[in-house]
Amino acid sequence: MLGAVKMEGHEPSDWSSYYAEPEGYSSVSNMNAGLGMNGMNTYMSMSAAAMGSGSGNMSAGSMNMSSYVGAGMSPSLAGMSPGAGAMAGMGGSAGAAGVAGMGPHLSPSLSPLGGQAAGAMGGLAPYANMNSMSPMYGQAGLSRARDPKTYRRSYTHAKPPYSYISLITMAIQQSPNKMLTLSEIYQWIMDLFPFYRQNQQRWQNSIRHSLSFNDCFLKVPRSPDKPGKGSFWTLHPDSGNMFENGCYLRRQKRFKCEKQLALKEAAGAAGSGKKAAAGAQASQAQLGEAAGPASETPAGTESPHSSASPCQEHKRGGLGELKGTPAAALSPPEPAPSPGQQQQAAAHLLGPPHHPGLPPEAHLKPEHHYAFNHPFSINNLMSSEQQHHHSHHHHQPHKMDLKAYEQVMHYPGYGSPMPGSLAMGPVTNKTGLDASPLAADTSYYQGVYSRPIMNSS
């Protein structure tokens, strides 16, 4: 295309002298002597300045441009398209606009090329919108919002920080009668903590093991006036406050029952008087056998072990029966206890006497009242309305009005308008409860917002 255009002031033979120099020029101004464009340098410098506003990496772009222009200005300036495209990719919309604006301002010496150059340069205008065409070329693609991760669980379904003994203790202490069946303990845990609504067989086995192997829990048989299936479980009356200040996160120490055998006999004898009488006769017979060798000692001598407690005598007598006569012969002589001492020992082994008018579990009901003001106490897990019912010992069945777990754990939830902040006053954030599966029941959270989450004291 350029060969058909005769440029004034130059002969065709003069073009061969300009190709002795390398094609990669150091700057755009070197094109002035090769192409005979008087005003080209000015406009190229202006376009370079325009590109410099869009990108600081202009030197590589100008060398790309000069190499394509020095290659002989391919037909309709199409050779400039790749270089200009590269500059548009580096410089953004400002650089492409500067290149596109170069077409109408070409030198008058290239006036026959004006229309074609303007058309070719105008064809670069779509590259100015390259950032909006594909997100790969612009910053918009890097800052787009990521899709929410589906594998993140809500904090309301996280595992509670309580041990199984803590869960059982909380369930028993909130009950009106201070005793629950195994199924009622299961139901209480599932109602309060959504985590335990799955994998029920695993944690229910752990609950049964905790009830069986901890001395702080006692099994109470059903009385005739309470028909049903399964025995009741209650707290040991001597267990006291196992948890520090009512906080169920950690126990102070493991409770050990020193009178476990006697209390088991007392619990077994609560149903029938005949069983109690048989146990008294058995204990007296064991005490008599243990004191049998002592009858051969002189009346004036006193055994050094005469101050031993009846429980120790009971254990010693049981060991003597297991080991046979050699153990009884090797045991030190002991004086025969009087009938009054035998009655006291039997009463000590059998526990407190039972009144026929009282239910058998009346003596097992713990009467400990502690000020549980800890954030992880049962009073903070339950609402004030339920505490009012329990303070007056209402025995009629009613639906428990419990606080949601995310309020006690201070997790506002993903839809909450106040993420990461702890509400020290009355709770007004109800959007965090929408993630809970219990939110469908409108009466369930009645009374929840009447008390603060954490106590200020």
UniProtKB/Swiss-Prot annotation:
Residues modified to Phosphoserine: S212, S283, S303, S306, S307, S309, S436, S457
Pfam families tied to this protein: Forkhead, Forkhead_N, HNF_C
Chain positions covered by the region annotation Transactivation domain 1: 14-93
Alphabetized CDD domains for the sequence: FH_FOXA2 (cd20039)
Region of interest: Transactivation domain 2: 361-457
Location of the DNA-binding region in this protein: 159-252
Keyword rRNA-binding on entry: no
Biased composition, class Low complexity, residue ranges: 280-292, 339-352
Motif extent (Nuclear localization signal): 106-113
Keywords assigned: Activator, Chromatin regulator, Cytoplasm, Developmental protein, DNA-binding, Nucleus, Phosphoprotein, Transcription, Transcription regulation
A single Gene Ontology CC term: chromatin
Post-translational modification Phosphothreonine, affected residues: T156, T301
Molecular function via GO: DNA binding; DNA-binding transcription activator activity, RNA polymerase II-specific; DNA-binding transcription factor activity; DNA-binding transcription factor activity, RNA polymerase II-specific; DNA-binding transcription repressor activity, RNA polymerase II-specific; nucleic acid binding; protein domain specific binding; RNA polymerase II cis-regulatory region sequence-specific DNA binding
Entries under SUPFAM superfamilies matching the protein: Winged helix' DNA-binding domain
GO biological process, one term: endocrine pancreas development
Subunit and partners: Binds DNA as a monomer. Binds TLE1. Interacts with FOXA1 and FOXA3. Interacts with PRKDC. Interacts with AKT1. Interacts with TET1; this interaction may recruit TET1 to specific genomic loci to mediate their demethylation.
Job description of the protein: Transcription factor that is involved in embryonic development, establishment of tissue-specific gene expression and regulation of gene expression in differentiated tissues. Is thought to act as a 'pioneer' factor opening the compacted chromatin for other proteins through interactions with nucleosomal core histones and thereby replacing linker histones at target enhancer and/or promoter sites. Binds DNA with the consensus sequence 5'-[AC]A[AT]T[AG]TT[GT][AG][CT]T[CT]-3'. In embryonic development is required for notochord formation.
Cross-referenced PANTHER family: FORKHEAD BOX PROTEIN, HEPATOCYTE NUCLEAR FACTOR 3-BETA
Descriptive protein name: Hepatocyte nuclear factor 3-beta
Natural source organism: Homo sapiens (Human)
Gene name of the record: FOXA2
